[in-house]
């Protein structure tokens, strides 16, 4: 029996299962006799033919799966070598697969482009977008980003209220290896210079600890508090991530060559620098880590709907051609479309210079972008202090 194979790659998100459900629903509608298989743990599971039959999943369970964050099929960051590619092709042939849909980020797209370029069979290879980093080229924004940005915006608004009540300095380190979209997302809720985050440090702009301390000191002197959003991927003037420099050679990389940043020494070093420069100030550094990417309590409905639509569109196109699904914004609404895989594979989208006002604040244009994506800020009372 002919089949379509679906897998999930890279880091989980709050809505990646919606993309899976969209693909399942569309495949059922387009070919009721098609077998729908889910590969456990991405291409790793596919090489071992470790799959689950999703064909008979009930509508109730499909809805529950879509509303559940993180990767229902499991995930991997494996990059298949030639032996693994042969095993994948063999598995796809054994399953009589008409298409392989892989949901993930730019490394996942790169894996699919590798498979597509080496395939000699009838199988189509379609990438469905996912990443909280929002760094896939050719996309206006990416499923998973809005929900993660909503978490980060809530976190900074909450900590701003905390540090109004008990003044001091607060830094939160936010995920984002090469792009600062998630780090800058709280700018959506800024209405004036007193609203946090007061300083935003992104990988797109060179970072200096000395300049950072001067910046903090200026805000602290003006407001009596300073709340900072800092990307885990901040880089020095040479382009080297500060977290990598602090690791002193003990760098952990995944199969795609990405440095492991989350959970490193960056927060500890920033804390030390703050305490040294401002010994009498209340200073706190937190690493948000994995919390924003799949937080059950803050899943945005628009993010869910767009993720589902991306999965459905991937399945619709998978019957005729390979490619990468991207989200396009026409000025009024977001629509999925298909572009060649090599336009997305292994590439990184950065925040444009026009999104910045200097090196540590977001411009009006940048704020308009984030405001368009995130829901409005809750109506909170401005404290008396």
Predicted segments, located by residue:
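C-terminal non-catalytic interaction/assembly regions of soluble proteins
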Residues: 244-385
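Short, ordered loop/turn segments at secondary-structure junctions
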Residues: 9-11, 39-44, 77-78, 105-108, ...
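Glycine-rich oxoanion-binding loops at beta->alpha junctions
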Residues: 47-98, 107-108, 132, 143-146, ...
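N-terminal phosphate-binding or glycine-rich loops at protein starts, especially the Walker A/P-loop
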Residues: 1-50
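Accessory alpha-helical/coil subdomains and C-terminal extensions
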Residues: 34, 99-104, 110-114, 118-122, ...
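Short glycine/serine/threonine-rich phosphate/pyrophosphate-binding segments
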Residues: 13-23, 46-47, 81-86, 105-113, ...
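Short glycine-rich or small-residue beta-strand-to-loop segments that form or flank ligand, phosphate
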Residues: 3-13, 71-76, 98-103, 169-174, ...
